Amino acid sequence: MKIQYIIGILIAFLFASCSHEEEEQKPAYGKIDVAVSVTLPQPESVNTLTRAGGPYTDTDIKNADLLIFDKDAKFMERVKVDNDRLVVTGTGINFTVRLDATSERRIIHLVANGRSADGTSDRLNFGGITPGMAENAAISSLQTASLEHVDEGESTLLKHVMPLVMWGRFALNGINIVTKAEGVKLLRSTACIQV
């Protein structure tokens, strides 16, 4: 009799546990590391003396900013990468950045040297980009400070233009723990020749 009673209770628990609809479990998302590998534009050899003895070369990267857009090309966030997180390689830089995990596509604009060399102030007007802003409008709104307001003088102009601002765009079809962005190519957005 005890065995039938125990079997009956077990069957009742079994039916009770199966009768509840399974709740849809959403994956737990948060910030995860994404490795980014950047290929720098190679300088062309020119038979003039440009920035001789200057503190920067045409390929120096002192900091980077990632502008993250969603699958609908709407701005989401800006992620800063400081100099101490950049690893220089023979042809570029590598760094790891923390981004929100997602199964959806992300469009990423990488702006190198968009801040001062020490990373304390913006050289581009990133503050004009607001969440939800369309990619085309956001990117076309970025500008450097006008040279009209820069004092005359070689060192001041050099500080204003160097290191060169460089730009790259890439897309990730989802972000998870194995996501890598390799071979991101940068273009110089300015040129500077000092005579």
Q: Model regions: which residues?
A:
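C-terminal motif of bacterial Sec signal peptides marking the signal peptidase cleavage site
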Residues: L14-S17
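Short, low-hydrophobicity acidic/polar segments
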Residues: P27, K31-Q194
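Positively charged n-region of N-terminal signal peptides that target proteins for export
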Residues: M1-Y5
